[in-house]
Amino acid sequence: MIVNNTHILTLPPHAVSTLTCILIWHRHTDATVYIISSYPTLTFHSMAHLSLHQY
């Protein structure tokens, strides 16, 4: 889904932050599930990658 930047700017800052976190979380979750199900040996690497991006 393409998000209109102009529409984002009209939202309250906390709403933008929340939506951004949710989108990032879902994207990383989908990627992690795919990696774990397809390449079990990369599970540790993917989890380390996620932990780095949580900050």
UniProtKB/Swiss-Prot annotation:
<protein>
    <recommendedName>
        <fullName>Uncharacterized protein YOR394C-A</fullName>
    </recommendedName>
</protein>
